[in-house]
């Protein structure tokens, strides 16, 4: 349902005169990063985080990617939505597709201050969420930087039906596939993410 929610959200925002920077399919941390990097007034991620496929919603951040919650603006947004009385719009906002992932990858690479003396083998479990494409971009960046890391991908392609189960690595029953892959491939470690990859579990 994310695409339908995103379409409706963009339509509502632009009809109110808001310009929308469309990042495409991203993870929550990428939205936080882009909101600050692009000096946007706010950011919205369409996500149900680590919940099952029939859930969905929005995560909101304000200036400087500060989270918006009940104690700093969310209740006011709720009240405005419930009143459903908005001033007429002078102009419709625009939609500006933008790929901020290269900047995000470069920011991650700046955290690497040393290079392993041998190739690190990492099992990476995207849980059929949005981590898969981001990991591919990170993998390319690591190769360009000459950092010897090998990703062993499982449940990699985004699929909102989550055929491998709810993408919540905090649940013990969802850890087995990553654990077994680490053993099978003699990996140095494994990492499993939730659906919008703002939380992870290390093996």
Residue locations for each model-derived region?
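Gly/Ser/Thr-enriched, mixed-charge loops and adjacent short helices
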Residues: 56-185
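N-terminal small/polar loop signature for handling phosphorylated ligands or for N-terminal nucleophile
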Residues: 1-55, 138-202
